[in-house]
Swiss-Prot record:
GO terms, molecular function: ATP binding; hydrolase activity
Any Pfam family: Actin
Protein name per UniProt: Actin, indirect flight muscle
A GO term from the CC aspect: striated muscle thin filament
Organism: Drosophila melanogaster (Fruit fly)
Length: 376
């Protein structure tokens, strides 16, 4: 428990990871996979106390005998029963708090359907009996965490990427662009190109191994063609990785071919623009007077922006697209993997924010629709 009686909770529900903790802290207390697993086989051993479902790390560690499901797809909650399990797990097992005693700040994807916001609100008040809650847009929180109120955020997580221009604290919905290309797609692509090398990864459990390879060894090349030539000419870029069974695999140009798909989605057979063009297009949808401020405040956020070399490459690509006289600055805070959560922690602990909460009383009077009036 926090010192103050009703310390607010901040929960950032991502497609891949759920980040949860207490407002005012500088990092989330709990970070666990947004997974619900159900046994594939009937238990053989009597009295093992097999549960009918597992959440988070426990599901991850028993992945060999479970079927894993992600209730959040492309940043948007699609399976509410499983989502409820994840929230229950967050309150009771991870944070060990009584949800009826703490206000909760939840995060949502930009362009989240209205019905979804209402459903989130309803579950918090009716299932968990929260005293108060608020829903904030993820990218806006990332910008706050970087100490700005104006800028463009490229938020790229496991399930979806968004470019969100924000002016004086308000997201500009007409200029938000969504790109269904993110960490999970890169993991799948890495699985595919490793298969071409003769290493087979197919199951949901093996995908987690590939995700680990991706996080530890991949990087973004400043010049892709040149890097490919270097990789072909020598073994200087090769790295080895030990699989859980002790087998050692070698990975070479896959290290930068995998994240290159962010800049060239055609690698994945997608016809969309790369992340650099998406940022540029998003800026061009904004009023001409604020573009300069956006170019100078381009903030990266989310786990898929953690690749070494990504900021330099973005700088290079956007400089090539933008007018030559304009100053371009890519901000890549070291804590950007959790900057949405950190922004939420900052927001929920501001004294000026305390009147913004939707209280249980307001919810009882107005119903779930209150969320559209109070959170924007």
């Amino acid at each position: 428990m926090c010192d103050d009686d009703a310390g607010a909770l901040v929960i950032d529900n991502g497609s891949g990871m759920c980040k949860a903790g207490f407002a005012g802290d500088d990092a989330p207390r709990a970070v666990f996979p947004s997974i619900v697993g159900r046994p594939r086989h009937q238990g053989v051993m009597v009295g093992m106390g097999q549960k009918d479902s597992y959440v988070g790390d426990e599901a991850q560690s028993k992945r060999g005998i479970l079927t894993l499901k992600y209730p959040i797809e492309h940043g948007i909650i699609t399976n509410w029963d499983d989502m409820e399990k994840i929230w229950h797990h967050t309150f009771y097992n991870e944070l060990r708090v009584a949800p009826e005693e703490h206000p909760v700040l939840l995060t949502e994807a930009p362009l989240n359907p209205k019905a979804n916001r209402e459903k989130m609100t309803q579950i918090m008040f009716e299932t968990f009996n929260s005293p108060a809650m608020y829903v904030a847009i993820q990218a806006v929180l990332s910008l706050y965490a970087s100490g700005r109120t104006t800028g463009i955020v490229l938020d790229s997580g496991d399930g979806v990427s968004h470019t969100v221009p924000i002016y004086e604290g308000f997201a500009l919905p007409h200029a938000i662009l969504r790109l269904d290309l993110a960490g999970r797609d890169l993991t799948d692509y890495l699985m595919k190109i490793l298969t071409e090398r003769g290493y087979s990864f197919t199951t949901t459990a093996e995908r987690e191994i590939v995700r680990d390879i991706k996080e530890k060894l991949c990087y973004v090349a400043l010049d892709f063609e040149q890097e490919m030539a270097t990789a072909a000419a020598s073994t200087s870029l090769e790295k080895s990785y030990e699989l859980p069974d002790g087998q050692v695999i070698t990975i070479g140009n896959e290290r930068f071919r995998c994240p290159e798909a962010l800049f060239q989605p055609s690698f994945l057979g997608m016809e969309s623009c790369g992340i650099h063009e998406t940022v540029y297009n998003s800026i061009m949808k904004c009023d001409v007077d604020i573009r300069k401020d956006l170019y100078a405040n381009s903030v990266l956020s989310g786990g898929t922006t953690m690749y070494p070399g990504i900021a330099d490459r973005m700088q290079k690509e956007i400089t090539a697209l933008a007018p030559s006289t304009i100053k371009i600055k890519i901000i890549a805070p070291p804590e950007r993997k959790y900057s949405v959560w950190i922004g939420g922690s900052i927001l929920a602990s501001l004294s000026t924010f305390q009147q913004m909460w939707i209280s249980k009383q307001e919810y009882d009077e107005s119903g779930p629709g209150i969320v559209h009036r109070k959170c924007f």
